């Protein structure tokens, strides 16, 4: 007897048994089996028939079906070939009218350079917990068209993503995400709605894209790559003053102190006290002095 609608615990286990799936921790495979949780995520994302949604790590299709239920198109990026091959069949069986609105991309999300088809408008995903931050930043970098999103991540990671300057947990993820977007925590998800049950709680983060800081008045030579190099250096040792943390980029702490002061920032401040706008101003001063090249990690 065929089933329709969203997945439940029984259908999750049935599909897993059919394809011989044994969830692995290395790929962060924990599948949501609670329809109320799925609909809650979709409701928070506020997507509908006008949207084309990126979903990273669709797994067995719980959230995919919830997104398709709204009338949205879904581009599902899945690294596991067995899961990627199964997903269209699951959608065709449980939500036949939505099958044509699903596109599956078999790939590691970090290897994706372009999202196929029409421009996406949103990112909604239960991100693999072991790579959640790099995947989120990568999707923001390669696809500037999407403007809103909701992601489910480990609770501790959710706290770090939304942390403000001055917080003990404010760091590289918080600062880099703030370059692209405003992020707020919008909910908690208990372990009991997953199979297998993880040993951590989960959190929901809503993302609203915005223009990078100082876009209008910024020196055009300043790039995201440069800003992220300074972010990495500023947080490499939380106890270091900024002049010491950036000494390697500036040719010494004295030169760093002069350049940081020129940016209107206290060189004795620590990275954890600075927002992304402050760090962008530091980069601008460094770039104007020729202290930075345009190389470095995104």
Curated annotation (Swiss-Prot):
It comes from the Bacteria. One of its GO terms (cellular component) is cytosol. Its EC number is 2.1.1.182. InterPro entries: KsgA/Erm, rRNA_Ade_diMease-like_C, rRNA_Ade_Mease_Trfase_CS, rRNA_Ade_methylase_Trfase_N, rRNA_adenine_dimethylase, SAM-dependent_MTases_sf. Pfam families: RrnaAD (PF00398). Gene3D superfamilies: Ribosomal RNA adenine dimethylase-like, domain 2, Vaccinia Virus protein VP39. Transmembrane segments: none annotated. It is found in: Cytoplasm. It is an enzyme of class 2 (transferase). It catalyses: adenosine(1518)/adenosine(1519) in 16S rRNA + 4 S-adenosyl-L-methionine = N(6)-dimethyladenosine(1518)/N(6)-dimethyladenosine(1519) in 16S rRNA + 4 S-adenosyl-L-homocysteine + 4 H(+). Keywords: Cytoplasm, Methyltransferase, RNA-binding, rRNA processing, S-adenosyl-L-methionine, Transferase. One of its GO terms (molecular function) is 16S rRNA (adenine(1518)-N(6)/adenine(1519)-N(6))-dimethyltransferase activity. S-adenosyl-L-methionine binds at residues 30, 32, 57, 78, 108, 126. The keyword Coiled coil does not apply. Its main location: cytoplasm. The keyword Protease does not apply. NCBIfam families: ksgA. Belongs to the class I-like SAM-binding methyltransferase superfamily. rRNA adenine N(6)-methyltransferase family. RsmA subfamily. PANTHER family: DIMETHYLADENOSINE TRANSFERASE, DIMETHYLADENOSINE TRANSFERASE-RELATED. HAMAP family: 16SrRNA_methyltr_A. Specifically dimethylates two adjacent adenosines (A1518 and A1519) in the loop of a conserved hairpin near the 3'-end of 16S rRNA in the 30S particle. May play a critical role in biogenesis of 30S subunits. This is Ribosomal RNA small subunit methyltransferase A. It comes from Cutibacterium acnes (strain DSM 16379 / KPA171202). The gene is rsmA.
């Amino acid at each position: 007897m065929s089933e329709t609608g969203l997945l439940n615990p029984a259908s999750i286990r049935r599909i897993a048994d059919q394809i011989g799936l044994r969830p692995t921790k290395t790929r962060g495979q924990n599948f949501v089996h609670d329809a109320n949780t799925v609909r809650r995520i979709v409701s928070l994302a506020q997507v509908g028939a006008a949207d084309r949604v990126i979903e990273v790590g669709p797994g067995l299709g719980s959230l995919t079906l919830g997104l398709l239920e709204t009338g949205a198109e879904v581009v599902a990026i899945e690294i596991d070939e067995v899961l990627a091959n199964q997903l269209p069949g699951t959608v065709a069986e449980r939500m036949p009218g939505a099958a044509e609105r699903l596109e599956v991309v078999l790939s590691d999300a970090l290897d994706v350079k372009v999202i196929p088809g029409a421009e996406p408008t949103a990112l909604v995903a239960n991100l693999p917990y072991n790579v959640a931050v790099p995947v989120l930043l990568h999707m923001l970098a390669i696809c500037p068209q999407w403007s809103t999103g909701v992601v489910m991540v480990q609770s501790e990671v959710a706290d770090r993503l939304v942390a403000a300057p001055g917080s003990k947990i404010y760091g590289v993820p918080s600062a880099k995400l703030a370059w692209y977007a405003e992020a707020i925590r919008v909910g908690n998800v208990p372990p009991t709605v997953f199979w297998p049950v993880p040993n951590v709680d989960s959190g929901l983060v809503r993302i609203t894209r915005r223009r990078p800081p100082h876009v209008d008045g910024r020196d055009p030579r300043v790039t995201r790559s440069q800003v992220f190099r300074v972010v990495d250096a500023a947080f490499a040792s939380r106890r270091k003053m900024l002049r010491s943390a950036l000494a390697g980029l500036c040719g010494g702490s004295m030169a760093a102190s002069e350049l940081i002061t020129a940016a209107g920032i206290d060189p004795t401040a620590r990275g954890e006290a600075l927002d992304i706008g402050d760090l962008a101003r530091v980069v601008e001063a460094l770039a104007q002095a020729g202290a930075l090249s345009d190389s470095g990690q995104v």
